[in-house]
Amino acid sequence: MGPAPESSEFVHRTWVQCENESCLKWRLLSPAAAAAVNPSEPWYCFMNTDPSYSSCSVSEEDFPEESQFLENGYKFVYSQLPLGSLVLVKLRNWPSWPGILCPDPFKGKYVTYDQDGNVEKYYVEFLGDPHSTAWMSAAFVGHFSLTLEAADCTKKKRWYRSALEEAYQLYRCSAEQRLEVCCLSKPNRAKTDTKAAVVTKKGMQVSKINTEKKRPRVRKRKRDAALKCSVEIFCSDEALSKENMVVSETEGLLKELEKMLQQIQEPTAREDESQGEQLSQCSPESPTGSPFQSYHEEDYIVPDGAGLKAGEYIEIITNNLKKIDALISEF
């Protein structure tokens, strides 16, 4: 604990940070020394007019707590940190946690002020996997330093490590680049969250807004067209194969009928010297609308040297015609 604040030692004095990446300590300057600092140029510890704190190897000087200033009638006023600043937030029962100052998606601002117009709270998106957000008192929010040593974290160690690693990566980024990382603070996310679901009194979810982008239907159409084409080709091939089989069977039956007709049309009356009998000749003529005319059951013909009744030939021909009709009816 440093000297008592009532000594006016800290009144009107200015804190300046050393820009040496291996130091980044804050030094307390007198009004005269602070007036000599050029804001557009980097400042280092060796430029400090106070020899006690003019080296990067010297620790930061102690500074009284805010409560001590309040007890002695002083008001602690915090300078406003810019939007997108990488900060370190003091938490209760947790180690100091890195975060980014970003706008509240509902209020649209990242800082609030008290009645006197001084900074009161900041909206912080805490880093790590996963991110989280909260409004924090300005008294607990300060600049993040690369010299920060990882504190002992008794719970959620992996979460804490991921937060520090992300902070180190974002340290050299611009404020705009850091704000791009703040996924929980996007204005459109607030609208999405408020319309995410409509729930009935019984707690049954009746509708949801699908925030995912719809997949293009072009590929589906192409896939359906290709599938339809392949099915049509398969069906046409199958039908063609079946048609060829039917045609082949029909041709076989027609050849058989043609052979039988040729045998019927040949003159069957032959001279039988031993018996003197003459067989009657069948001469089929095809009337309109019927492939064959009627035959007498008692007539005889001689195909291939065997004697058969004409009625049996008619029955064979009729059966073959029925088979042809059955094959044709399939189409």
Curated annotation (Swiss-Prot):
Report if keyword Metal-binding is assigned.
yes
> What CDD domains is this protein classified in?
PWWP_ZCWPW2
Q: Does the keyword Repeat apply?
A: no
| Cited PROSITE patterns | PWWP (PS50812), ZF_CW (PS51050)
Question: By its UniProt entry, which Gene3D superfamilies does this protein fall under?
Answer: 2.30.30.140, 3.30.40.100
Enumerate the residues binding Zn(2+): C18, C23, C45, C56
- GO terms assigned for molecular function: histone H3K4me3 reader activity; methylated histone binding; zinc ion binding
Where is composition skewed (Polar residues) in this entry? Answer: 276-293
The family database entries (Pfam families) matched by this protein are listed as:
PWWP, zf-CW
Q: Where do the zinc-finger regions (CW-type) map? A: 9-64
Q: Return the annotated region ranges for Disordered.
A: 264-295
Keyword terms of this UniProt record: Metal-binding, Zinc, Zinc-finger
Q: Which residues form the PWWP domain?
A: 83-147
Protein task: Histone methylation reader which binds to non-methylated (H3K4me0), monomethylated (H3K4me1), dimethylated (H3K4me2) and trimethylated (H3K4me3) 'Lys-4' on histone H3. The order of binding preference is H3K4me3 > H3K4me2 > H3K4me1 > H3K4me0.
PANTHER family given for it? ZINC FINGER CW-TYPE PWWP DOMAIN PROTEIN 1, ZINC FINGER CW-TYPE PWWP DOMAIN PROTEIN 2
What free text does the record give on domains?
The CW-TYPE zinc finger mediates its binding to trimethylated histone H3K4me3.
The protein, known as? Zinc finger CW-type PWWP domain protein 2 homolog
Organism name: Mus musculus
